[in-house]
């Protein structure tokens, strides 16, 4: 963007021009300034100088919006001081009569513009602008170095004044009385301290006793738990042995029942065999009786036949 646009002194250009003071130009460049202020409107000119810059907008509304939005903003560790070029802040100038920017610009001798189209306008040099703003606005320079640390002055020793013997005697008496008073005070303080120490010791003793009691309780509980844990395996073993014994007895009972059932079955089988034998014997006897009965009528018939034979003869 053209930088000579910011040199125009016509009222319209002055009212739409923004002055950016307290700018850290060592870090902030022209492109940064344009990027920051382009969001408020179209920029037709921008110039960056040592410690300050100018931004030329198309109209005054955009310039005022930029002043309202960016004044007091911190950039590169410095708080910006922004206002319209035609309306400098009153409380910023140095002591003395403050003149408006138009008056300051008007006091400068006019010179023709380099371009024929801008022959009616008047441009100013950057040097003049820098001098003008340096005169009108005071900006803090770099932070001055801290003052050197003053060396500690060692006070000179006082010379002892030698007095007469009477003064020495009085001073000795006073020192003795002071020592006595201090000793009595120290004795009282020692007594108070001793009482306080005794109280603290008694409190500590009580705490220690309570701690010992709690430790004894804990030890007793632990011993009980240990006894329970020791006795529990024995009980488990006893229970297991009882269960084994009961299972063995149950098994024995089952075997006895089986044996008895088997013996009963054998007895019943033997009884059945005996019964079968008896039946067979009875059946044999019956058959023999039947045979005897059959023989008897045959014998009768033989007797009859023999008798009939005898009769015939």
Swiss-Prot record:
A GO molecular-function annotation: mRNA binding
Gene Ontology biological-process entries: mRNA splicing, via spliceosome
SUPFAM superfamilies xrefs: RNA-binding domain, RBD (SSF54928)
Modified residues (N-acetylalanine): 2
Subcellular location: Nucleus
Coiled coil regions, renumbered to chain: 191-226
Protein name stated in the entry: Heterogeneous nuclear ribonucleoproteins C1/C2
Annotated SMART domains: RRM
Position of the Glycyl lysine isopeptide (Lys-Gly) (interchain with G-Cter in SUMO1) cross-link: 240
Primary residence: nucleus
Bias-annotated ranges (Basic and acidic residues): 250-261, 285-294
Modified-residue entries (Phosphoserine), positions: 113, 115, 121, 162, 166, 229, 231-232, 241, 246-247, 249, 261, 268, 306, 313
Per UniProt, location of the Glycyl lysine isopeptide (Lys-Gly) (interchain with G-Cter in SUMO2) cross-link in this chain: 8, 50, 89, 94, 176, 224, 237, 240, 251-252, 258
